[in-house]
Amino acid sequence: SKLMLAAVVLAGALSACALKQNSFLLATPDQPKDQAGHQAKPGWATQGFSVAAANPLATAAGYQVLKAGGSAIDAAIAVQMVLTLVEPQSSGIGGGAFVLHHDGKKVEAYDGREVAPSAATDKLFLDAQGKPLPFMEGVLSGLSVGVPGTLSVLETAHKEHGKLPWATLIQPAIQLAEQGFKLSPRLHQALLAENDLINDAVAASYFYDAQRKPHPVGYVLKNPELAAVLRDIADRGSLALKQGAVAQALVQKVRQHPTKPGSMTLQDLAQYKVIKREPLCFDHVVQTTGKGFQICGFPPPSSGALAIGQILGILNNTPAGKMPLQQGLPDSDWLHFYT
């Protein structure tokens, strides 16, 4: 069914100016290429703003929002909505997200990670004999689907830092879903490596041809079912995934898994709460110049900022911090301390 396709996509995977729905004219830039081996990338520096995303279509959507007078949060919302469509193997509104926001004065951390359903216990991934399930058996089941938080966290951040109307920010993704987008090499490779998605009839009809092979790179995928979901999101915000037909389809998909059904309920969806956390910040001084920085990132349950702080803290207790760069690059001795 139409809603079930949207549920497959969701279960599988952070005021001033009003714009008309057709104000976003989306060109199709080059799609991301396959990452095979080392590639040299130029450095980029900007003075006004920049947008970085995993797919150029998403980057373009964020750029257009900023040009229209939107805030960084506005742009991030447009980016995430497009990624839900064009990068379903990696990112989507059916999962969770961290949002780290800095306005030049204050750093804020919004935790929108997915959470376990209320009925989950510490035996969730154990078999009848009390032994751990094989990893992929647990992943490819209703057991591994958490209560999604991405829409809620983006909505919360938008209420505090958004400039453009919420519905405006969903329009680029709606247009691409209806008009179609070219299947990228990255998505194509992910489908080639995937052995189980083909067994879902709804997903198979979308991603694969009649010979059960992934559609080729450049094939135009249209997703009117997801466009309908996005229109509901434009109208109702995060409630679109908490109450109503889409929420019911999502719960049904999880609870009716043929071998390992999950326990997620409509009440789990409705009760999801975003958590405002204290950012993890630490001071770092470049010993060769004496210049100091405050580096901030997301606190646990994220691990990136914590790991960076540990790495820099360890380096500061070695000679590495005082070693000058050679033509802007560290030498082999520095790399020895780093590794």
What kind of region is each of these model predictions?
Residues 6-13:
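Bacterial N-terminal signal peptides
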Residues 12, 39, 201-203, 329-333:
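Alpha-helical structural elements
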Residues 280, 289, 293-339:
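Internal alpha/beta scaffold segment
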Residues 1-5:
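Bacterial N-terminal signal peptides that target proteins for export
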Residues 22-60, 64, 72-236, 241-243, ...:
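Noncatalytic scaffold domains of N-terminal-nucleophile
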